[in-house]
Amino acid sequence: MSTNRRRFLQQLGGLAAGFGVVSTGLAACGGNEPSSDTTKADSVSTPAATAAGKLFFEISLAQWSLHKPLWEKKLDNLDFPLVAKRDYGISVVEYVNQFFKDKAKDEKYLAELLKRCNDNGVKNHLIMCDGEGSLGSPNDKERLQAVENHYKWVDAAKYLGCVTIRVNAHGEGSREDVQKAAIDGLGRLGEYGAKAGINVIVENHGGYTSDGAWLAAVMKGVNKPNVGTLPDFGNFCIKRDGKGMFDGKCVEEYDRYKGTQELMPYAKGVSAKAYDFDAQGNCIETDYNKMLKIVKDAGFTGYIGIEFEGDKLSPEEGIKKTKALLERVGAIV
């Protein structure tokens, strides 16, 4: 995770933003039925061909891969679908609410975004939601406010034709207290999401959530067909030596392969995190052969989202290298 994103999450982690219902009158690209099979991807995902040489999954593009040009105003959120399709040949996108955080209830804006999606033949898959409070807070008032803060993103996802929102399950307290609170918070949000046909999924994203066994236990506790996980290949740092969840060097890291394996039974999406590559085009920090085998063995046939986050390569080059790696390894595992 980049410094900018860490700062953003710290600044917005406790904000209460209220909620409201967005009209769904405009036809959306993509369906909205929540998944009823927690061992697979979203029920509306179109499985990729599994014949020899073909991928067992489909590739999507996580908007965070382009966070640098987005923060620098070199790229506008409304142009993301076009860029994904034109520059990278990717027809499925994953948004980050940070790049249109004040537009969740702006129907005119959402309509324009959806129009650009449809004009370019791009499908909206999910919205990653940060800065809307702690769904795992042991404080009842804080947790319930966080649940309500996410309602508007469920509504926006419905409008845009997404099937999923990605949330965080952070909270301050003991492992047991935060786990109990997260089960309650996610369960409540999951109920709201189910009414709209939207899945609610949690990423391993720092703190207790980067402990695969802990997050898997939360999923078992929630026990709802539309509440699941978004395993991220690289976000398994549980503790850092700086202040806050995302500052400083990682001093306690969960095994990424073990964690991914534990989270895959509940996965409704996967994030292919990459930072750097060797001369052969392999990801340096993650063995993609090993990781994609774990994903495949879990029976997953949905979307694997490219999330390049490195500093040595440009976002454009990093996205292309991650895509090439997924295509090469995905065809042979």
PLM feature segments, named:
Residues G25-W64:
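C-terminal segment of N-terminal export signals and the immediately downstream linker at the start
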Residues K54-F56, V92-V93, G187-K293:
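Acidic/histidine-rich catalytic cores of soluble enzymes
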Residues N77, L110, A146-H150, Q179-A182, ...:
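Aromatic/hydrophobic pocket-lining residues that form the small-molecule binding cavity
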Residues R86-G187, A194-N199, P225, N235-K243, ...:
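Structural motif corresponding to the early beta-alpha repeats
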